[in-house]
Amino acid sequence: MKNFISILSIFIIVSCSSGKTPVEEGLESQILHWGNGSEPQGIDPHIVTGVPEHHILIGVCEGLTITDPKGGRENLPGVAESWTLKEDQKTYVFNFNPNARWSNGDRVTPEDFVWSWQRALTPTLGSQYSEMLFYVKNAKKFYDGEINDFSEVGVKAISDYELEVELENQTPFFVGLLAHYSTWPVHKETVLKFGEMDDRSMKWTRPGNHVCNG
């Protein structure tokens, strides 16, 4: 008898439930349900370091290049729809996708990357992946305080749609590094609206504040 009552109770509970899957509920409410495994520490690409954060960032942000989602080794276009390597084999010119946009509608520009890389290389921000950019000419010198003028670092917006990056040495794998979230851009106006360039509070990433480009 007890078993019958237990089974009946389960049947009633199941019958009273909506029966909708998370996917169905998401489609109905237009809310993305993401099974991330664990709580992220944040979503500032220049501060976070973990896998849970990475899983979220690749869904909402984009760098100059992206990794092949099918597992291929080729670097695929991201914000940069194409790029060229000059004869010195150290200088890249990235050509931006004119349709690349921030979530607030602003166009993603080469200057966004210049400012973002300066932020990532600012020691007081404490980015644990700043060395990813040390392949760029004078980037380590700026990080170490040997130079203070960021214009001496080898990253420049040479037009509204072109970013030039000069490296210290020939680095064939550099384009692949640009798919790592620590090299991705952040929205300057939004970051500065909620703090300084090197503010680690991540207020700019909170709900209602966050602007992304993915």
What role is predicted for each listed range?
Residues 2-9:
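Sec-dependent signal peptide recognition
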Residues 14-15:
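C-terminal motif of bacterial Sec signal peptides marking the signal peptidase cleavage site
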